[in-house]
Amino acid sequence: MTTREFDYIICGAGSAGNVLATRLTEDPDVTVLLLEAGGPDYRFDFRTQMPAALAYPLQGRRYNWAYETDPEPHMNNRRMECGRGKGLGGSSLINGMCYIRGNALDYDNWSTHKGLEDWTYLDCLPYFRKAETRDVGPNDYHGGDGPVSVTTSKPGVNPLFEAMVEAGVQAGYPRTDDLNGYQQEGFGPMDRTVTPRGRRASTARGYLDQARARPNLEIVTHALADRILFSGKRATGVTFLHGSARVTAHARREVLVCSGAIASPQLLQRSGVGPGEWLRELDIPVVLDLPGVGRNLQDHLEMYIQFECKEPVSLYPALKWWNQPKIGLDWMINGTGLGASNHFEAGGFIRTRDDDLWPNIQYHFLPVAINYNGSNAIEMHGFQAHVGSMRSPSRGRVKLKSRDPNAHPSILFNYMAEALDWREFRDAIRATREIMHQPALDRFRGRELNPGADLKSDNELDAFVRARAETAFHPSCSCKMGYDDMAVVDNEGRVHGIDGLRVVDASIMPIITTGNLNAPTIMIAEKIADKIRKRKPLERSNARYYVANGAPARGGKPARAPAAV
């Protein structure tokens, strides 16, 4: 491949990069080179295409960068997983397919930061709608003709879903019929990025499928970006590794970095943009001393609160190899059955204290007892809640360890570094126990398997969190948007102090959102795509949305009080 020129070069064909590639090439006179370090999203590989197989990609390295943190000092010095997607679709190719946009107040809070006034919820909502096709049709909150297929939960799938939602309501928390609609707060059905044919709705399927045949888009897989090239303070191209060759491509307009919250700061640092002292440690020529690159790293940490199930209604039999051929065949031929769901079909968001302005705890309900990555399956019928805090004050960093593009960076999330983290996790465990002991779950609830009913004191609960809490795989905020001294990009994703260079992915979030990150990342890319194309922003929404405004976290008394559990 000889040196060539394109208008735009996109590094990373993930949740954001595929959106940009598709939208920019809608203009036939614009040429785009899309680089992806992984391979194609093979449509016959059940590991990425079958929703129920979501744990499989995390167990290997074909589709997973399989990063690992440095020893986390507040987590028994454990080196913890940090899985990131590798292949067309990026992390949308291996994620849990939960379609959660975040709380309206996440975006309203962003907009209070200097220069981010056009990132309110009502400014963002039109872009969420633009990206989405929801199976039950559009309304003020949801789209009907976007690239991403969103499937709603249907009643009667598993009695544990309805029982867990009802238990949350019986504990005094709100019920909501749409976690992405008027009111996120409460318990209810969970939307999923799954097609009507029961396939994963990655951005490769939703976006690239409509763009890959365009003559003005070139997609190169197995292309690992090495460095961004500069002329003075202007980005001019990218050098990447493709097989045994080192290839250079030039960008007439811009280089767009969409490599995610780990690899985007890594690429910037390797290219000479980042904290000067870090770059000098590796003898990297400093193009721009930008101290925020790799700082402000955030994630969601979660626990699995697990119970034995007294009735044989869980997914436990589906884990047995002798039942899996039938499940796979039903999915492959009909796009239905257990294989067609990620089985996160209910969940919720609550405030654990009345003075929380919006939900600080998320629930994913699952009708089986197993770790997210498929490990530690409990050998019995069981169910669980994935529970974690949403906006930890702890901050970490991504730091380059080597100039070798194949070397992983040093990653430290610094989980549980603040007193608020510990308070929220203790509150979450106690609130979950109270929910699980409500009458709606009486017929199903057996023994508490994890943490175990005998663990009650603060010290005992803290020890459980240190030993057993895991990542929810939501790294973000490491190239934050804003205008303070630690901001990396402006409100349009443009890197401060550099021309022709943007970062567009979850790394530019100033503060992590309340929930899963795939939907917000797609929205961010849709919004910035209009900025790049110099198009008028979509008209601001006037939809109503819920604000607690001092209302108690629980609107009613629990059906069964804590003293009785």
UniProtKB/Swiss-Prot annotation:
Gene Ontology MF: a single term: betaine-aldehyde dehydrogenase (NAD+) activity
Keyword Oxidoreductase: yes
Reaction(s) this enzyme catalyzes, per UniProt: choline + A = betaine aldehyde + AH2; betaine aldehyde + NAD(+) + H2O = glycine betaine + NADH + 2 H(+)
Keywords assigned by UniProt, alphabetized: FAD, Flavoprotein, NAD, Oxidoreductase
Binding site for FAD: 7-36
Leading EC class: oxidoreductase
Active-site residues annotated for this sequence: 474
Domain of life, source organism: Bacteria
Enzyme Commission (EC) number: 1.1.99.1, 1.2.1.8
A biological process term (GO) from this entry: glycine betaine biosynthetic process from choline
Cofactor: FAD
Gene Ontology cellular component annotations, sorted alphabetically: membrane
Main function: Involved in the biosynthesis of the osmoprotectant glycine betaine. Catalyzes the oxidation of choline to betaine aldehyde and betaine aldehyde to glycine betaine at the same rate.
HAMAP family: Choline_dehydrogen
Protein family: Belongs to the GMC oxidoreductase family.
Protein name: Oxygen-dependent choline dehydrogenase
Gene name for this UniProt entry: betA
